[in-house]
């Protein structure tokens, strides 16, 4: 059975890129913002890994991370934050909120794949 990758990004192009790249190994579930992603998770769905954008309407990336990490069922799910912001202060904010990693857009899908799989492998021990 495929693992589930939750993609939280308001850009349809990013959702499409990630779906096409990861669909062989994951069931990819796109959500347009943190609020919709939390609603999906609160309905009893689970994710094995999450890729989330920093800047989104309704609930942005940092707010999503905080809600996710306060959820008993989802607090340990590997999460990589994507952003067009290169400032170290943005990266530090995301990591402090509970992101496991941070990548700047544009990103290399293969690198993202390796980072996700490495995190998931470490959790399986």
PLM regions: where:
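Two-component/phosphorelay signaling modules centered on CheY-like receiver
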Residues: 12-30
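Acidic, metal-coordinating helix/loop segments flanking the phosphotransfer/catalytic sites
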Residues: 32-49
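Receiver (REC) domain active-site loop signature in two-component systems and cognate sites
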Residues: 56
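Short, conserved "switch-loop" micro-motifs in signal-transduction and mechanochemical regulators
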Residues: 85-86
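C-terminal output helix
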Residues: 107-116
